[in-house]
Amino acid sequence: RRHSFPTRRSSDLIDKDYSNLNQIIEDMFETMYNAEGIGLAAPQVGKNIRLVVIDAKSMSEDFPGEDMENFKLVLINPIIEEEFGDDFTFREGCLSLPLVSDEITRPSKIIVTYFDRDWNLQEKEFSGVKARIIQHECDHLDGKLWIDRLSPIKRKLIQSKLQKISKAQVYHKYQMKFAGK
């Protein structure tokens, strides 16, 4: 599977008749697992649709109190309705930007509405690391990356790494497709 440099535009809503949706979901999980990720948004694999897959089981030892073992979701057309709670700072990285990470501050709780894989409408509250993962992936759907949340100084500090990524001059375990390449 090719892993795309994400588009920087808002993704489109989809409906139940979207072509090959179940196969796209399976392919996204496979791509995410092969890259040793915990979440993947459709724009990262070249699909400009509002679709996210998450499986954070690999984080269960690092966050024993958050039940990461069972945190596996498919979010179709997710919308973060509300962000609230104390600010929560956490080191974020991304499959789209290999070898780059930094501390990002976000609200600690969210309310998100989405359709699950069976097209049941869900409205749920998430907190802590679970909220963080959903916020990060939903940013992709809105054409944003975690680096957009950095201060100008911090962004300047990683600029050379970002340029290497955009020129395909970085080593990573998974195949990527670069914009303009």
Predicted features by range, described:
Residues 1-7:
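Single conserved hydrophobic/aromatic residue that forms the stacking wall/gate
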Residues 8-135, 140-181:
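Active-site rim/adjacent substrate-binding subdomains
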